[in-house]
């Protein structure tokens, strides 16, 4: 890591902004459309099992897409002499939904919700290297909601006006207990 931020925030520090766009549902012309997709993924060595189901519905004025994903990450298997890294596996589920409304030919409203929940995420390095019998994140939860209002214009100085309001919430719990100790330590951070 480079720069002064790497010292303050550690080697995982990331500078700048990354803007990612999730899947957009499309409006249809004519009849309403309904479709779905599914995905099942299995990785050998019990390292990952994933199942996802998604649904898309659209009309001339309303378009929706959403889905749910369930994941079971098993313990990591290292190469050479590392072997199985226990404990390192955890469970996760995520949910996403986005609906768009075509209010007029030039005005559109989008409402979106994303949610991720992870349970019993172990900190392998603390258990193996730092004398802990138990050290894990439980529970980790992140939610993001936003509403986006877009209006196309015929103005010379602007093609479109966009107004976005968003809210996000992160909850992180940590549980730990040192080897040979009966004291279980629970911590919780809730950021909005």
Regions found by a protein language model. Give the residues of each.
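Solvent-exposed coil/turn segments that connect beta secondary-structure elements
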Residues: 3-4, 23, 43, 116
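Short loop/turn motifs that connect adjacent beta-strands in outer-membrane beta-barrel proteins
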Residues: 9, 25-34, 61, 106, ...
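N-terminal periplasmic accessory domains that precede
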Residues: 13-39, 51-53
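Exposed loop/turn and edge beta-strand positions of beta-sandwich/beta-sheet ligand-binding modules
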Residues: 14, 32-34, 49, 93, ...
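Transmembrane beta-barrel wall of Gram-negative outer-membrane proteins
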Residues: 42-72, 82-120, 141-152
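Flexible loop and strand-edge segments within Gram-negative outer membrane beta-barrel domains
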Residues: 86-88, 106-160, 167-190
């Amino acid at each position: 890591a480079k720069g002064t931020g790497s010292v303050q925030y550690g080697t995982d520090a990331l500078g700048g902004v990354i803007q990612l766009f999730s899947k957009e549902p499309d409006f249809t012309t004519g009849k309403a459309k309904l479709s779905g997709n599914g995905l099942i993924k299995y990785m050998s060595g019990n390292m990952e099992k994933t199942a996802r189901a998604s649904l898309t519905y659209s009309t001339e004025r309303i378009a929706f897409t959403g889905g749910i994903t369930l994941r079971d990450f098993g313990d990591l298997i290292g190469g050479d002499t590392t072997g199985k890294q226990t404990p390192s596996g955890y469970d996760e589920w995520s949910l996403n939904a986005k609906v768009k409304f075509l209010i007029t030919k030039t005005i559109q409203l989008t409402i979106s919700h994303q949610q991720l929940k992870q349970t019993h995420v172990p900190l392998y390095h603390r258990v193996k290297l730092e004398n802990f019998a138990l050290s894990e994140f439980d529970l980790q939860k992140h939610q993001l909601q936003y509403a986006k209002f877009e209006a196309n214009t015929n103005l010379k100085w602007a093609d479109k006006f966009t107004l976005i309001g968003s809210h996000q919430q992160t909850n992180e719990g940590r549980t730990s207990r040192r080897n040979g100790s009966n004291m279980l330590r629970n911590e919780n951070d809730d950021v909005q």
